[in-house]
Amino acid sequence: METSNLISYDDVIDAAYDIFLEMASESLEPVDVILFTAQFDDRGAAEAVETRDDWSSHVGFDVDKELYAEVRIGLVNEENDQLDDVFARMLISRDPDHKFCHILWKRD
């Protein structure tokens, strides 16, 4: 597939955030939902990161890093500006003809 036909990373982030918001209340602990909601305006982030190699063990197929993007959603540490409280790691297809999303939720 030509990379020009792939969904942009910005659109992938937007889709990931929409999916996260829709599923968070059912998938996270109530305290994490409250924490995320209360602090998102000041510290919240959704960002595309380098797709890690462990996804194949979670989804059962080899992940093409051109066709799939990893998005992390969580809270940024104000001291070092790092997204270190991750509520969800998401693998999303960038192929508009092959919709796919897999989420690894935060577990305490």
From Swiss-Prot:
Gene3D superfamilies: dsDNA mimic, putative
Domain of life from the UniProt record: Bacteria
One Pfam family recorded for the sequence: DUF440
InterPro entries given in the database record: dsDNA_mimic_put (IPR007376), Put_dsDNA_mimic_sf (IPR036763)
Protein task: May act as a double-stranded DNA (dsDNA) mimic. Probably regulates the activity of a dsDNA-binding protein.
Family according to the record: Belongs to the putative dsDNA mimic protein family.
HAMAP family (UniProt xref): Put_dsDNA_mimic (MF_00680)
Name of the protein this chain belongs to: Putative double-stranded DNA mimic protein PBPRA1522
Organism: Photobacterium profundum (strain SS9)
Organism phylogeny: Bacteria, Pseudomonadati, Pseudomonadota, Gammaproteobacteria, Vibrionales
